[in-house]
Amino acid sequence: GILSLFTGGIKALGKTLFKMAGKAGAEHLACKATNQC
């Protein structure tokens, strides 16, 4: 029903945000490691 659609959307959004944050974090660590921030 509506609720399962809603929770599915929340989960998908969370996954996307987590991926984006992970990518940004990795890039930040890489620039820190090479002193290019």
UniProtKB/Swiss-Prot annotation:
Q: Does the keyword Disulfide bond apply?
A: yes
GO CC annotations? extracellular region
Picking any one GO biological process from the record gives: killing of cells of another organism
Which residues form each disulfide bond in the chain?
A: 31-37
Keyword terms = Amphibian defense peptide, Antibiotic, Antimicrobial, Disulfide bond, Fungicide, Secreted
Organism's domain of life? Answer: Eukaryota
Q: In which tissues is it expressed?
A: Expressed by the skin glands.
The cellular location(s) given in this protein's UniProt record come to: Secreted
Question: What is known about what this protein does?
Answer: Antibacterial activity against Gram-positive bacterium S.aureus and Gram-negative bacterium E.coli. Has activity against C.albicans.
Family (UniProt): Belongs to the frog skin active peptide (FSAP) family. Esculentin subfamily.
| Name of the protein in its database record | Esculentin-2L
